[in-house]
Amino acid sequence: MSLQLGVRLAASAVLILILVGVIPVVPLADRGLGTGSAAAQEVKTGPSGLPLPRFVSLSSDKVNVRRGPGRNYPVAWVFVRASLPVEIIQEFENWRKIRDWEGSEGWIHRSLLSGRRTAIIAPWDDRAQFALRDAPSGGAGIAAYLEANLLAAVATCAEDWCRLEDERFSGWIEQNRLWGVYPQEIIEE
């Protein structure tokens, strides 16, 4: 085997390990480098042309999460509820590497994901109730109190508030109480 072929094979093996998540890739900004540069401000896009990371929701009530991007990889766990929000952090062909609200990561086929936006109310604080307001203001009337870990559809977000709509309730909640939207993210109906 020539040296050039050996180098190509080694580089290909490293690339595959990065794509399947065996070798983590840490952005320069996470190492304290490149902050404030133009590159650090650019939106990263995946091979699909969509931004990375981004939130989506599960489109089925049974979704296998695999250890790698393919049906030949073992199932790590199974989601058993549709509409749960997950964060896409990587793409490989038709597979999406996702992260759930607990920080667990795995691969899901893109056909099992939906662009419909949902969020979980404060999953990090299971002792609390949160006011759902009639308007996007802390002084607005209270439409309902929502329990932590409640799943809700996100209709719109702007200026640190999100409008949640459900067959049981409708109103505004502070954006920082939700897992499934980014800080200051704008979501239009």
Outline where the language-model segments fall:
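N-terminal secretory signal peptides that target proteins for export/translocation
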Residues: 1-7
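Generic structural signal for short, solvent-exposed loop/turn connectors between secondary structure elements
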Residues: 1, 16, 159-160, 167-168
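Second-shell loop/turn segments in exported
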Residues: 69-73
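SH3-family beta-barrel domains
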Residues: 34-67, 78-82, 89-92, 99-101, ...
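Bacterial N-terminal signal peptides
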Residues: 10-24, 29-32
